[in-house]
Amino acid sequence: VVTLAVLSMPFSANAADAPINAGAGTTVTVGDNYEIEMTGNGSTAVAAAQNANVTLGNDAKITVDGDSGYGVQTNGENSKIEFGDGAGIEMTGNAAVGVETSADNSHIKFGESAEIVLQGDYNYGASVWSENSSIEFGADAKITAVSNAVRVGGNDSQAIFGADAILTTSGDNAYTVHLGAASGSSITFDNGAVINSDGHASIGVFIERSGEVSFKDQAEIKVTGDFAYGVYLQNQYDGNVSKITFGDGAQIEAHGYNADGIHVEAENSTAEFGDDTVISVSGEDSTGVSFGGAGSKGVF
């Protein structure tokens, strides 16, 4: 095992620290205020190979300017990357990814007040793209993107958010929260989550295949745009079953022509609401709650 320790480093806004590329079986540990700046298409700021472990202290900052770049990526199985509080990741470029698990059984974890900002089309804020993997955020996480704030595409994988998360997308056909795995996966939010989506045919919470998205109390979902959905459970193939649950005090808004607050299209799937739920829509041909799949239901 090789260990690189860079502790109590003096912070400098003028001199960037080195990118981190942890080789197979290595352990890399850096202290607070570690700052990585990269320019160029296909760049990756922090990467972990098979069985590697990377730990960064508080207030780490990552900036990547270029198409198809990665801020943080697990590219080897059984790898782990962990941040302290106050991490910041900024991506500029098309098809960029802020944070992604790309290898099975890999995990990325953030402390409190992490923020990911992406500028460019076809981008992803946090992406769990491998099986048996996870990305976890502490309280007060913020993700701002054009195309997709968080997606889970690997089976038996999870994205987990602490209290008061704020996720926002601003592009047409954008998905703020996207669960696309075939089986066994989930996205969970603690109290006070805020989901915003502003764009034509955008979706606040999209369950494409199977799995569950769950919110605790006081969740807010707001979408604005023609043909937008606050929540959409799609009937993607025969036999997929999906579920969305809310705690008490949820507020769901959809504004625009033919907009839907909640639409459950998948068969035998469920939308479950706690007490004091408010669903409000505006716009011609807009709908508050609709169920299109055989056996689908709402629990109020």
Report each predicted region and the residues it spans.
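Beta-strand-rich solenoid/repeat architectures in extracellular/passenger domains
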Residues: 14, 27-42, 54-68, 80-95, ...
